[in-house]
Every structure is written in structure tokens, then in C-alpha cells.
Amino acid sequence: MGESDAESDSSSNSSSSDTSSGSDSDARSESSSSESSGREEEEAKQEESAKDAKKTDDTDRGEKRAKERDAGQDEQPTEQKKTPAAEPRSERQHISHSAGVEKQQEEAVAAAEAESEKLNEAKKVETPVQRKEEAEASSVTKELNSPKAQEENAARELEERRKDEEQPVTTNGSSKESPVEAAAETVKPPTADHIEEGEITDKDEDDLPTKEEKKAVASKSPPKETQRKQSRSPDGKRRRPRSSSRSPSPSSRRRRRSRSKGSRTRSRSKSPIRRRSNSLERRRVERQRRHEERDKRDEERAKEREKRHQKGEPTSSRRRDDSREKKRSPERKRDRSSSTPKSKSSKTPRHTETTETNADNETVTEPAAKITERQRKTVDVLTSRTGGAYIPPAKLRMMQSQITDKSSAAYQRIAWEALKKSIHGYINKVNVTNIAIITRELLRENIVRGRGLLSRSIIQAQAASPTFTHVYAALVSIINSKFPNIGELLLKRLVIQFRRAFRRNDKMVCMSATRFIGHLVNQRVAHEILALEILTLLVETPTDDSVEVAIAFLKECGMKLTEVSSKGIGAIFEMLRNILHEGKLDKRVQYMIEVLFQIRKDGFKDHQAVVPELELVEEDDQFTHLMMLDEATETEDILNVFKFDDNYAENEDKYKGLSREILGSDDGSSSGSGSGSDSDSDSDGESGSDAEKKAEAGDIIDSTETNLIALRRTIYLTINSSLDYEECAHKLMKMQLKPGQEIELCHMFLDCCAEQRTYEKFYGLLAQRFCNINKIYIPPFEEIFKDTYQTTHRLDTNRLRNVSKFFAHLLFTDAISWDVLECIQLNEDDTTSSSRIFIKILFQELAEYMGLGKLNAKLKDDVLVESIAGLFPKDNPRNTRFSINFFTSIGLGGLTDDLRRFLKNAPKSVPAINAEILANAGGNPFRDGSAPAGNTKVAPSSSSSSSSSSDTDSEDSSEEDSSSDSSSESSSSDSSSEPKKKRKRKDKDKKKSKKATKEKSKKTKNKKKKKKAEKEQEKEKEKQRKSKKEKEKDKKRKKEEKKAAKKKSKHRRKSQESSDSSGSEDSDKSTSESSDSSNSSSDESDAEPQAKIKRQEHVEKNKFRGRTQDSDEFNLEGPGSKNRFQPNGNGQRRRDNSTGRERNRENSSYDRERNRGNSSYDRERKRGNSSYDRERNRESSYDKERKNRNAVAHDRQRKRDRSRSYERPTIRENSAPREKRMESSRSEKDSRRGDRSSRNERSDRGERSDRGERSDRGERSDRGERSDRGERSDRGERSDREKERSRAKERERDRDRDLKGQRERKRERDDGSRDRSRRERSSRRSKGRS
């Protein structure tokens, strides 16, 4: 009986200790309530403890005796430990006996409760577990009072004291236990409530006992009636129950301690207070052991677990008593240590059961056993409530890296913390410039799993820095386009935040929330209806703060609302206008409303809806949330907290695939620490829908070309720092350019060369050296040549010259192939002035380097025939003539010999076709001024064949000979004029039959009539002027001729002799030239263009000093009004006769103008029409008369001016009569000299005009039929004006000369009148008389 009581007591104590250690967290959560109730119990029971002090002393004495008796009965504790299953019957007896004892104890507890409730019924609250403990303690004390138990206990105490002296004592005062016992005591499964945050537990362990287990336990336990019967002592006296609340007096504590020595066998180290006071390390060790040994649940463990749940924790009073045991005397400690064998013996049934279960569980391993102790420490440090001890960051990262199991809570918790940290860091770093980079980094993190963290971070960052609201809104718009659920969550939280702040009258939070919502409206994340609802809410019941918030909100999204819903914002502004008119608000708010109206009037120009740099999402890609102000109800704050994910690895892979689709192939650097995926069911659907969306940007491309700029800078500095090209090439070859950078080097050579003021051979040699070193540089230079030719119009003259010389150097050194010339098409349509200048300088440079012969031989090479087909075209005679004239004009006519032969041997029908093309085009194909010819239109009567051109030449020459004085020319031209006239008439008859020529002739006739009428009017006016001038001249001549008649006759004779001699020479030369030209025209009628080109070359040879030579002889910039010729050989062209031209150049500007006038009027005589010829002859005669009159008037004017200068009344009045005679004689002499010089000039002019007419006959014959009469009249008028201007200039010069002469003569006379002696005067008189 005593053994069973002891065993039941020990089992109950051990189970209670297990419960207390296992439910540590539950005790913490209820500590405050339990401690407060314990304190009330102590205060209420202090009075009761004083009354019961005497009774407890008696019971203590009885308990000592009962212990001694029971010591003898408990002799075989170890045998029961080894063979617990061998005696099932005895065990059942012990259980039934303990049940009876428990029944008696319950009766004692009920009596004790009745007494205690009388004192403090309201304060004391006892649990069923406390009642059971009280019952067990009272039953044990009752049994231990028997005499046999006292004797046995006394004997056993002696033996146990000896054993205790030999056993070493632990640090906490308890004796050592066997390893099996220690494992059984330390490995105690906790209750379901004792789970710390982040603790790894088994789910099966936390389950409550099932109904079947409860039924089995209830069937095994004895009924309450038997317990009540056994609760009384053998003598029939009811025993006093042990009170749960103990008195604070030391005597009562000693009595209770001594009374419970035999029953409370648990050592000090096993108390819950001791366990709680131990270090964290010990608790972790216990938890580890508990996880390792807990695998299966059998029936026995289910029973124990049911008991543990029923009993619960010990009361707070017992915990205080256990804590006070530390202060007890060494005797109490020795007494307690002496009772440890009994406790060991009392625990044997439980230990046997646990050893059986441990033996069975050794073969089973749970997943939780995979986590090492180091990993568990890391998790505890991260997840414990107190934070744990400080661990350096490096060590912490090392500990975290050792956790690799993604399915564990430790790994997921670490990943969650890293995700939170990375999202917060990215949000704090975002700005306008790096928003694209930050967005890509955020999309690499699992923002679907951490969408709550992302929304919270963005809202907090925006509230902290409202000036960056537009940046955060742009970031949200980008994320919303990919994950609309994130944008919706953030918008919900913002709306709820605004409503809460509006109810609390928190203006600052309202301002920040509305500002963010306004920018989300601008970015099309939120619908404009939400903005209008907020504005209506703020303005409906206006206050100072609400109107201020509304104004701030309107400034942010007013432009967008005006674009989207003008009526809605108009209604809001009307409400604001009414508020302003009421005037109930503060003055400051009224001013703010007025400012807002002004901003609206300006069109919100200072408050743009979206900054251009932040307009990153297309309108079609954006997802707009239509959310009303009352719809947002749930903020989903649970998303801000860590949540364990069973399918962590699967969701992580899903998000990685989604991130790759969004970001493209640039996902290799994604961080694994923050990766993960949301475990919600809706995330899969969202990922499926978002997977169809593509990335906004691909690979990162450096648009600034930083590396290219650095390379160009290095090449430029290397080129400029080198002394010669060899050193520069050596340095550049050391740079080890990457593949593809060769073309940049070639471009730098050309750019540096073009930048120079003049071409430097350094760059050509440098490029040549690179082409010779490596052939990889040849294709880039050839490509650059073609590109440069196509873009020559972008280069100025200096750059164009340097570039063309640069490529000329590469060509003549054969650094690049001559096949690059195939890109040049030398014709009128495909060239520009810049391209012609480029070709000109290129070939001139090649001719200078190679010589004309070598260059011609190179171009005639069979390999280059196809490449130079564009330079020397043979497809069209028009293009052929253009090429011939171009190269001839730049001084390289020798290159066109083959083209001339080709054009000479071409059939005659080709020029006719060319003439039709020209007639349809309506102008000269050489509009760029390739030869010095007049700007004339194609006459309808012009013939395209070379024979017709020769006919017109001979006819014009015959007509001119008939009007001139030279008989030799007329005889030579008349001989061949008659048959040619017949041919010409036939050609004219054929051409007149054409409709196009008739229409053109009509137009030209109308124009000619108009011009004739205008000319006649001008002529009449000129005649009137001339008549007036002639009258004046005649009066002057009569006076002057009487004085100088003799001297004029002498000078006339001399001038005639000189003019006859020079005229004969000129006539001989002109006749020879005209005969040569006529012969050449008659002999070579088929090759007229070639003859013209030869004449052009002859012109180039006969350059004379007075004329400024053009650089190219080919007008590359455009045609001049006077310098044009027709490519078919029939245009006007000016012959340059050496003798006549040289004399004309040497004469004064007046003579040149006169020759131009004569030639212009002579050209008008070239038409075959007789009426027109007569009119032309009449005009020429008028012109001659007018010129003569002008010359006479000019001479008279000069004489009049001189005679005025000589008339000095002062000198004549003061001087002697002899001096007056001298002055008159001088004036006569001067007048005679002027007359002679003027006559000489007139005679020279006539002779020159005759010579010019004879020398220009060939030229007139070429140009006669192509020049329009209107243009001739215009030229005549221009020549007249130029003549008048030149005459005015000459008059001014003469006047200046005369004034200077007068001044000098005056000075001489003044000096002579003073110093001359009478001798000199007499000698002068004698000379004058003689």
C-alpha cells in the first residue's frame, strides 16, 4: 500500500513537472493573472495559516513516522525498472490502490475547501490540478503515519545517507541520475500552447487527446465512490487536506517541508522555477532531445499525456515555495538529498515506460532531426522574442549560409528578412535617373510574395519625402503594369489611410495620401472617379483644412482631370467659387483659392501631370483600377508578416520564370536570398496572366557611347603627340584594338585630316601604312570613300579639299582599290557642285602625283573598265559631252580622247534624238556652268547635226563680211555661202512643219514684237537726247576748229598712217583665222563638238595678264548669265583670238565696254530674216552715230573744262599783255592736243571695233541662231548703261587730272612772276615772235 502510494505520488509529481516544463510559454502568457491571484490568496490565508500552525506540527510528526515505516516496504526499485512488463497484475493493484487513496484525498480536499472558502470566497480560485495534488499529498502523509512505515523509513534513511555521501552532488544541489532517468526527465513533450515564434515542432505532438483515449483512461481509473471511501484513515478520523496557499512563516514552511519529504520526491533541479531560471542553452538541449526521442505515440504515452493535460501547472504559491528552498539550512538540504533514493524508486514505473518508448523510437527519424544545432541557433537568434545574444554580421551570414533546406521554416524566415531588407533599400534609393534600374532590381525580387512589404515601404517613403511622390507613382505604375494586384493593394491602403486621417482630422496625413493618389491618377493607375469623390468629400462641408487639402490635391492632378473629365472638375471649381464668394473661410484659404483659379487659367503649366522623364508606361499597357472611395475596406495587413509556405520551392521557380519573361535574358544576376513566391492561391492565377506580358527593355545598352568616346580621345591624342607617321603607327598598333574598332580608327584618320587648315601628307602616309600592314583596314577605307562621296554636300570647301587629297593619296599609292570609283556617276543629274569639286580636286591631285600619261594609262586598264564607266559614260551622248567638257574644263582633256573618238564615230541620228530631249527639257543640260557660254534657249530653227552647224557658221560669216570693210573675208565667205543657204532653207522648211516648233516660234515672235516696241521707244528718247547734245557740240566745235585747224590736220595724218599699218596686220590675221575656221567647219562637219573642245584648249593656252583666271575653267557652283554653251555643238561659244583679245585687254575699260556693246549689237544681225537684218543694220548705224556723238560730246566737255581752268581773271588782270598772249597760246596748244588725242581715240576705237568684229565673226556664227532677240536687247541696254558708267568715271578722272595740272601751273606762274628777270621775259618774247 505504501509503495503504491509512493509510486502514484511520484508519477503525479513527475507529470506535473513535465507539464510545467512543457507549457513554459503558456505559463508566461498567464503569468500576470496567476501572480495577481496568488498574491490575493497569500494575503487571505495568512490569518488561516496562523490558526493551523499547531495542527500542522502534529501532522509533521506523524509523517516522519510513516516515512520510516514505508522505507522498509520499498526494497526493490531497480528490479521494477528492469522488468516493468513482467508484473502486470501487481501494477494494476498499485493503480487501483492509488485510486482509492486519491478518493480519500479528494474528500480531505473538499473539507479544506469548505473551511478556506469561509475566509475568502471571492479571492481564492483553485484548479482541478491543485485539488488532485492536495489529495495526493494528504493521502501520502496519512499512510506514512503507520508504525511499520516509520521503522522501514528509518532503516532506509541510514543506508541512503551513506550512498549520498559517496555520490557527487550536481551544481544545482540535486544528485546525479542515471542517463535513462535524465533523458526521461528532460525529454518532456510540451503542451500545444508552448510554441515559440519560429520554433520547429511536430504537428502530431500538439494534438489534444482524442475521445477514444479519454474513454480508455476513464475506464482504467476507479470510480469516485471508491475514492471517497478510501479517503478516510483507519481510525475513522478525517484528515486535514494540505492547503494550496501556504503561510509565509518559516515554521509552517518547515513543517510542510518535513511532511512532504516522502511524497514530494522530485529534486530541486526539476522544479519549473529552476527550469525557467536555467540558461537558454539548457532549454535548447532539452528541446533537441525531446525532438530526437519523440516519434511514436503508444497507448501508455497517451494515458500520461491525458493526465498531463488534466493536471496542468503547479500554482504560483508552490513556485514561490520552491524558490524559497534555496535559502533553507544545510540540514534541510541533507534531508532532501537523503530522500533522493525514494524519489528514484518512486519514479521507476514511469522510467520503465519511457525507456520502452525510447527503444522503439530509436529507429525512426523525423524531418525535423535534419536541422543541426548550429542552424537552430541561427533561427533562434533571428526569431526569438528577446533577440538573443549579439552575433557579428559576418558570423551571422556564415551561420545563415549553412541552412540550405528550402522547405524548412528557418530558411524561409531568413529569406523573408532578406526580402524585406532589399525591398526597403531599393525604395529608398529610387529617383528620376535610376528608376529603370531600380525597377529591374525590384522585379528580380519576389514582390508577389512580399507585396505587402513593398506597399508598406512605398507608402512610408512617400510620407517621409512628399517631394518624390511623382517618382514613387511612376514606380508603382511600372509595377502595376506587370502585377495589377500590387497596385490595387497599395491603392486600397492609401484610400483607407485617407479615410482614417479624414475622420481623425489629421491634415498632414490627408495631404500626403491625397498627393500620392493624385499622382497615381496622373499615371493612370487610379481612375479619375476616385479623385472626384475625394474632392467632393473635401468641398461639400468646407473647412479651412479640408479646402486646403482639396487645393493641394487639385494642383497635383488638375491637369489630368481637365483632360479626362472637364465637366467634373468644372463642378468642383464652381463649388470653390461659391465658397470664395461666401467668405466664411480664413483669408489665407481664400487667397489660396484665388491662386488656384489663376493656375487653372494658366493651364497648370507649373504643375504638369507627368514629367516627360517619368512617362515610362504605354497607355495600352497600363491597368487602371476603378475603385470607389467606399469600396476599400481591407488593408490585408497579414501580408506584412512572415507566413510559412509549404510549396516554397515550387512557387519560387514559378516567379523565376515570370521574372525571366518580364526582364528578358538579363536575369542571371538575380539574388537568391530574397527570392520566393506567395503561397496564396490567387498568386498562381496572377502569375499566369502576367506571364503573357513582355519586358519593357532588353539588354542594357550604353547609349552614351562612353567606351567609343574614350577610344576616339586616345587615338586623337596619340596622333597629335607623334612626330612622324611611323611613330604614330607604332603607338596605335600597340593599342590592340578590339574586333570592330578598325573602322573607328579609319574615321579618326579622316576626321583629323579634315580638321586641318591645309592638307598634311602625314595623314595620307599614316593611312597608307595601316593599309599595308594589315589588309583588314582596306575595306573600312573603301566604305568611308563611298560614304564621303555621298555626303560631300555636308562638307565645307576646306574639309572637301583635304578629304579629296587624302583619298587621292591612297589611290595613287594603291593602298585602296581603284574600284571605289564605281560609285561616281559623272553626269548632270547625279552630281552636285560639291561632288564635282570633290572629283576635280581628286583627279587634279592624281595627275599631279602620277602625271597625265600614267593616269591615262591607269584609267585605260582593262580591269578598271567597269569601275570608271560612270566617270567616262558612253551610254548617252549628252552624258558623254558632259564628261568631256568637265575634264577639259579642269585641265585634264587628255583623259577624254577615247570619249571624243566615240562621239566622233557615233551615228548622226544620236544628236537629233539628243536635240529632241533638250527641246523637251527646255534648257541647257549643262546648268552647272561647264563652259563660258551665254545663257540661251534652244531656238526652234537650230539644227542638231554637225553639218547644219557648219552651214550656219558660213552663212553668218558671209553676212558679216558684206557689212564690214575687209574685202578678203567677204570673198572667202561668199564663195561657199550659196550652196549652204540652200541646205539651210531645206532644214528650216522641215522644222517648220513640226507643231512644237510652230508654237515656240509664235511665242518667240510675240516676245520679239514687244521687245521691238520697247526698243523703239527707247531709241526715240535717245535720239532726242543726242540731238540736244549734238547742237551743243556743234557750237563748241566751230569755235575750237578756227583756232587749231593746222594742228589737227597734222595729227590726222599721223593717226591715219598708224591706223592703216595696224589695221592691215589685224585684217591679215583675222582673215587667216576666219579662213581656217571655215575650212575646219567644212571639212569636219561631223565632228563639230571635237573642234569646239580644241578651241577651248587653245583658249587655255592663250591666257593673258589682264584677265583674272578662274581656278577650274568649269563653273562648278552654277551657270552664269553669260557663260553657257550647248552640249550638242550648236550653242553660242566665244572664240578667243589672241591678237584682238590682247589688244582689247590692254585698252581702257571704255574700249572694252564699247567692244562688248558692238559685239552685242552685232549678234543681233545674225538672223536670216531680211526684215530683221535691215532693222539690225539700222540699229547698228544708230549705235555708231550715237557713239560718235558721245565721243564728240565727251571731247567738248573736256575742252570746256580745261578752258574754264585756264581763265584766271586775277592773273590776267594783274599780268602784262605779253603774259596774256602767252596764256592764250598755251590754252590753244592744250585744246589742240585734246582734239588730237580725242580723234586718235575715236580712230583707235573704230579700228578696234573693226578688228573686234572681224575676230569675233566665228564666234558670232556659232552663237547666232541660238540667241534670243530679247536677250540681245537686254544685253545691249546693259552694255549702254555700263558704257555710261565708265564714261562718267573717265570724266571724273579727267577733271581730277585737270585740277591737279591747274594747281601746278598756278604755282609755277606765281614763282616765275617773282623770280624771273627781264632777260628771261625778253628771250621768251623773241622766241614767240620768231
From Swiss-Prot:
GO terms for molecular function: RNA binding. Keywords: mRNA processing, mRNA splicing, Nucleus, Phosphoprotein. GO terms for cellular component: catalytic step 2 spliceosome; nuclear speck; spliceosomal complex. The modification Phosphotyrosine is found at residue 1182. GO terms for biological process: mRNA splicing, via spliceosome. SUPFAM superfamilies: ARM repeat. Residues 252-277, 980-1012, 1034-1054, 1321-1330 have a biased composition (Basic residues). Residues 420-603 form the MIF4G domain. The modification Phosphothreonine is found at residues 191, 201, 1108. Residues 710-826 form the MI domain. It is found in: Nucleus speckle. Residues 679-689, 952-963 have a biased composition (Acidic residues). Belongs to the CWC22 family. Component of the spliceosome C complex. Interacts with eIF4AIII. This is Pre-mRNA-splicing factor CWC22 homolog. The gene is ncm.
